[in-house]
Regions:
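Positively charged, solvent-exposed patches that mediate nucleic-acid binding
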Residues: 45
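Long, contiguous binding/interaction regions
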Residues: 1-41, 49-86
Length: 86
């Protein structure tokens, strides 16, 4: 069974976001004065193959996030796990 995984990471509350600040400044300089805040994160899509149980796939995704895809000290992550058809 194959699984489609969609992962989003973002900085934890209270962590400075220099990329978000730069994007906000850029948008304001382009005339988008109504932009109050911008937060930059990451979005990843991964396909896992040959895993028969959803809980095993979820455990693998959590391990990947904690070991490489997110920095658990400064980032939060969330994911969606969906069984692929076919």
């Amino acid at each position: 069974m194959d699984w489609e995984v969609k992962i989003e990471t973002k900085l934890k509350d209270g962590i400075l976001d220099p990329q978000g600040k730069a994007v906000k400044t850029g948008l304001k300089s382009l005339g988008y004065d109504n932009v109050e805040s911008v937060y930059v994160g990451k979005y990843l899509e991964i396909v896992l193959e040959d895993i028969n149980q959803k809980n095993k796939a979820a455990k693998m995704v959590e391990e990947m996030c904690n070991k490489l895809l997110a920095n658990p000290v400064i980032e939060d992550y969330s994911y969606q796990l969906k069984k692929m058809e076919g």
